[in-house]
Structures are given as structure tokens and as C-alpha cells.
Amino acid sequence: MPARRAAARGRPDLPTRAPRGPHPAVARGGDAAGRHPRRPPPAPPAVPDPARYDRMTYRRCGTSGVHLPAISLGLWHNFGSVDPFDTARAMLVRAFDLGVTHFDLANNYGPEPGSAEETFGRVLRHDLRGYRDEMIVSTKAGYRMWPGPYGEWGSRKYLLASLDQSLRRMKLDYVDVFYSHRFDPGTPLEETMGALAHAVRSGRALYAGVSSYPPDATREAARLLREMGAPCLIHQPKYSMLAREPEEEGLFDVLADEGIGCIVFSPLAQGLLSDRYLDGIPADSRAGKPHGFLRPSAVTPERQAQLRALNDVAAARGQTLAQLALAWVLRHGVVTSALIGASRVAQVEDAAAALGGPALTDDELAAIDAALGGAAARR
């Protein structure tokens, strides 16, 4: 040891170095290099139930070779960046356990727009990566996603740019179904259908579909897609006990004529056709949230009286009101699948259990119509 260092060590008037403590990052739970705090390990990937296909009914989609589960899960609500990820993950995993193989999205689902696709992609990568070929994943484009004239509706530019963005958000190479989300009266139908057909030919989608198209436009869209070599697989209209336009205005007749499948959205009328609103508006319900499409004004005393009457019909069948509503839409021969939303796992399980009930009788159908008091009262 050099003499100077030895002398310094022996001098009591020189300061001594304090004992080293942990690096500040380590004290916060990070590593010694100060990179970041330690995070709890992620949950292990889900292991799907081997009996899942025994629990679900599958229906042929129009005249195609595709079969869809009678109950499909939509990510319109409760899967966005404002919603708890763990709940969203649990619902997706449980749905797959119950034989739900179809997951329906759109570019604007959230909120924030696009975040539902990000959530789905995250769950798919972590929990269900090895099961992609057992799923039908659909997305749509049509509503506003970015500023300017190319951020919505049905132009080729918007649709194909939106599809590419959706694939990036989900980190997928393709979707099974790509929809035009709404009919665009300002764009030639040939252009919109041409974009869908191009998506199929390019391998970014396997099938084309349309949503919320009126009957005449649906028939013409089917003709165009057939001529372009990408037949229309499916139509997604709004349909429930409270919204019967698809059967009253001829859409179901067009779908039957054209051999197009049908998956109905809002079969529970945004959750109104459930036992949640029999006596009021729960704070944690869809109508009780500051965002969403079901507003408190829809839950009137008159509507609650109708819901209670429908609930009596359901109880007599040994079902919940939501299960009755699903059985009602699935009774129609054109309907391939009912697209449900959910905010918790129990709602997914309740919907799947609807398939175990008996077929609706003529007397029960008449009781449902009587409870709703005619067409004017349904809307």
C-alpha cells in the first residue's frame, strides 16, 4: 500500500466514506443500474378448456363453409383503454372456454378509438396465441377515426388504410372478416365493395361483410362482391325485441335470397333487456356511465313496466330476461349468431347458458308481443 494512503487511513481528522446503501432504484424496487422498478410477473397464459366445443352450438353462416357460434362476443364496450384490462382479459378467456370462437371488433371501438383492438391483440398474444386458427376475428371501418375527408365513410383510401391500422393494433397478419361498417350514400358502392374485395384478394381479410346496410343496398353489394370474386359472407344489423326493422323492412328476406349469414348486434338493446333496469339505473350499469349509447332517458317508467312483464315470461321458462332476449333473436332462421357485449364474466356465462333453454312456443311469442304493447311501444 502506498505510504500516503496508509497515512490517510491512520488520521482521525480525515473524513471517512459512509457505508454504501442500496442504489436508489433498488430501494424503489428496480435494479442496481437504475433502469426501472420491478414489476410483478405477468399472469400465466390461460389454458383453454378441452371441452369447450361441447358447450356451444355452431351455425352455418349463410351458404358458406363458415360456422359461427350461436353466441359471439363483441368488444364495442368495456374493452377500451378506460376499462380494467384484467376484466377484459377474463371475459375474453372465459368466452373462449365456453366455445365462443368469434370475436367482433371495429376500428373505433374503445374508448379511446382503437384501444379495444389493442386490448384484444394483447390478450391474444399472451393467452391465446396458439389458438388463432380456431377463431374468427372480425373488424370494421366506416366511422370517423381521424380528421379530414379520408377519415371516415366508405372510400377505398379510408377502408384500406383503416384495415392496415387495425392489423397493426392487433398485431395480426389478417382478419377473418372485414366489414364496411355503414352504408355510405356519398361513395359509389362499386368503390366500397371494391375495397373489401381488394382486402380479400390481398390476404388482409378472408371474407367480406357489411353492417347496417339497408335491404336494397345489401342486395346490390352482394351482387358486386360476387362479381368481384369475394362473395359477401355476412351482414351485421341491429336486431332485438325492441328493434325489429330487419324482419319488418325486408332485410332478412334479402339475406335468405342471397345466401348471406347474419350476426345481430344489440340483441339485448344495449343491455336494456336484462334484469339490471327492472327497478332503476344502477351506478355501475351501462346507462349509469358517462360514456356509451344507452342513456338514462331510455329507462322510463313505461319501459320498466314492459321489462318486468318480459321478466315474468323469462322466469316462467326458467331463464333470465337476457337469456329470453337471446333466445328470441336466435329463433329466426336467418340469424346465424347473436353478438353480445359484457362488462363482467358472469354476463358471458349467462349468455352462453341461454342456448340450453327450450324453443320459444307460439304462446310465449304472443306473451312477449303483448308485454311490449305493439310496434309503436317497442321503439
Q: Which role fits each region the language model picked out?
A:
Residues 62-80, 138-151, 174, 179:
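N-terminal small/glycine-rich loop or linker at the start of catalytic domains
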Residues 8, 137, 259-262:
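Hydrophobic beta-strand scaffold residues
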Residues 167-187:
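Active-site groove signature of glycoside hydrolases
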Residues 2-37:
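C-terminal hydrophobic helical "lid"/dimerization subdomain
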Residues 82-95, 154-170, 218-222:
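Short, acidic/polar
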Residues 83-87, 115, 119, 150-158, ...:
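Alpha-helix N-cap and loop-to-helix initiation/capping positions
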Residues 37-135:
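N-terminal binding-site loop/beta-alpha segment at the start of enzyme catalytic domains
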Residues 42-55, 183-375, 379:
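Beta/alpha (TIM)-barrel catalytic core signal, keyed to glycine-rich beta->alpha loops juxtaposed to Asp/Glu
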